[in-house]
Amino acid sequence: MGYNIHSNRKELVLVNPFQQHRWETDLTIQEGENFNLRKIMEESRGLESEEQCTAFYHADYSSLHDPFLFNDMELAVELVDQVRRQGGKILIFGDYDCDGLTSTALLLRFFHASGIHAEARIPNRLEEGYGLNEAAVEDIMRDPPALLITVDCGSSSAELVQKLMQAGIAVILTDHHELSQEEPRPLAFLNPCRRGERYPFKGLAGVGVALKFAMAMAERFCPETNPLPWISLAALGTVADSMPLLDENRALVRLGLDYFYEAAVPGLRLLGESLKPEIRKGEKPGTEFFSFSLVPRLNAAGRMGDTEPALTLLTTDDEGEALAAAAALEKQNEERRRLEREICAEAVERIHRDDPLLHRNLILLADPAWHLGVLGIVASRLSQRFQRPALVFGGDQAGEYRGSARSYGDFDILEAIASGREYCENFGGHRLAAGVSVKEAKFEDFAAALRDYAALPRSAFESTVSHHSLCILPHRYVQEESLNILNDFEPYGQANERPIFQINHLSLLNLRLVGGGEHLSVTLGLDDGREIGGIAFRSGELAKLFVRGDKVDVRAELKLHVWNEHRELQLLLHDMRFSEAERRQMEIEKEASQRWREGRPLTELESGGTLDPAMIPSFWCFLEKILKAGFRPLDTGLIGQAFRLAGGSKISVFTVERLLDLLAEMGLITLNKLQTGEVSAELCALDSSAKRPQLSAQATWKRLLAEGGVKNVG
């Protein structure tokens, strides 16, 4: 089935319901073989020895590496000690995202607790952008600190670091990003990715490096300090930045979750309790709670251009201040969501209204009024909704268009932007996501260059990604005991993903739309007579394909659904498709259709149906709605199923493909057969003055008529 639900929770993104994807399992368990879920999970995590299993299951404070393994840690601590003894001022230069904010807050908390004068500066995302910048450096030099410490930035700012040091400001860089060709030369440089760095783990977040710095300073200045509040910040920033939950990151995040209620900084605890009251009763939050509840609210501060509430929340010990900051963050997040919804809706309306835009391979939209802080989210939504790359631009006060780009399929969006580099002020990113700035006067030339680049065959935009599950889960293992085993592998996250299982041959007992039609709730029957509920977020379109009684396969996570102190096992659906027998019949009909195209007469084929001319108008109306909604590519078997549920008659794949051929021959659509076996169709711009095409004049109609493939002909 064609629902690739990229994320695991409420931010699930709707993808084309009429597209088939290849399902694969990472581990193949032979039928009759002893099924051991714990062993399967251990194998998938590369846990082969008893020692590896012990380290994985019991990751704790003792799993953390010595911070003094960093090449420059001794020097960095000594520099701070000099400033401390001299009573000098320290300035922490951070970043506006959750990793940068938690890094900044962590060092501020340490310095304030140690009696060291420290202040913080966070660049404004909307005005300054990421990291050290010329304007910020000039401002800093007007009131210079004795020591500047960067967190979560600085590795790509060699010239600006040199400028600060020439002005007499000592600089310590703490960062985790890959370095540019020119390595900065501060007095001390803490970055696990630095060339020649001996620190044993390269996967720390920016806040992980800040934590190591604080722990090293605490060891020298105040060894009795409790590090758990810092670890709560480090855990949140590590999850927010999608760092691998391996090695000491696993220990950091586990500690941060286990001791969240007892030891998290007051602002985080209060915000967490307001969003998840069960925390007050001792329930531990999970990484999903961090990712989908706390992180978006902290990131909203940066997106909206005002990080003060976020930094206050993370640094204050006053509950009144923390509650006020949490309320301000909630307001910012609501505004972020409102802007995102409004801009998305406006963008979709423009695409539907503008025929050329709907037909192009690449979406490029600009509006100087669109808020710069949400453009990346909007571009991602449009890319998935219309299944093509998307670039979305807003304007700034300097007369520039600043945009975010998201790719689709195998298309290299950074290479596309580079094709118009002569018109860009700057750009960067990677093949899947990028950012770009263009002067307003050059924007149309830039847009034309991108459209020329994207005038490629549709195959360039096809997604070749398979949908992977850990293994096929037997029905008898769909139970809470299995979930207990899976809980031992927490915390889940990057490089330790929560497992998705393929569960075959389920009975679809009930389905209903919930959440205003946005989500789909199902009841599924297992082969032992038990029933289990399932939810597919942002997947209401699934109701166009399935009915009660269908046999289906699903890709899903096992989850425990808790409400009003009632606990119930539930499936969180990622994909749903027809079971093997139905899919096999579709393939037989597709093969018959292909042989007919190759010249085999209808009488020699099991085509699965004939064409009734009375269905052509209703099929055309049905298809037009699908294409106007931007769905592509299309699986002809799923199109037939959806047409039946939309009120049309039951038709075979062969008939669907003949109807598409006829509409293409009549000039109503353009039709391309894709390498995946699906089709891509586009609506044609119709000339109202042109002569209306006649069905009887089309080659497909004539051949079907001659071979007895048309019924109800007068």
Annotate each PLM feature.
Residues 106, 183-223, 227-239, 618-619:
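Short alpha-helices
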Residues 176-177, 371, 430, 519:
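Histidine-centered active-site/metal-ligand motif
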Residues 21, 40, 112, 117, ...:
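Acidic, two-metal ion nucleic-acid-processing modules in DNA metabolism proteins
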Residues 151-204:
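Histidine/acidic-residue-rich, glycine-tolerant segments that coordinate divalent metal ions
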